[in-house]
Amino acid sequence: MGIIACSGEELLGGTLSRAAARIVVEKLRPQETIILCAPLFAAGGLERHGGQEERNFAKEHPTITIEGCEEECAKIAVDKYSGPPAATFNITEFIDAHPKLKSMSREDLGEDGMKLAEIIAEEIAKKVDELFIRK
């Protein structure tokens, strides 16, 4: 299953989305998931760099997008080039649901930010499990 995280660097949500994606892929569901490169996916046509491989993977396998803000760039790209994502998570919803967990900054999530990334990753892992059961 593919995971495409926000690649935005200006917002805390982008950093949290990438941290959560790494937790899912490296710790929680390493056998079931891979990270797809968002810029390469969007650029496409860069065969020497595997651009079509990213899009083709998302066409053939369920893909989850993790959005750092309401713009939903990853979801829009997956919709456009590979079909609808299997699920989309918006980091803003998690930030709003856990107001006591305050990240230090987008450059340094701190302990609370990493706890929030873990919570997000756990929810994504549940969705991975749900999608694998449906297959």
Regions found by a protein language model. Name each.
Residues 1-135:
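Iron-sulfur-associated redox domains of electron-transfer enzymes in respiratory
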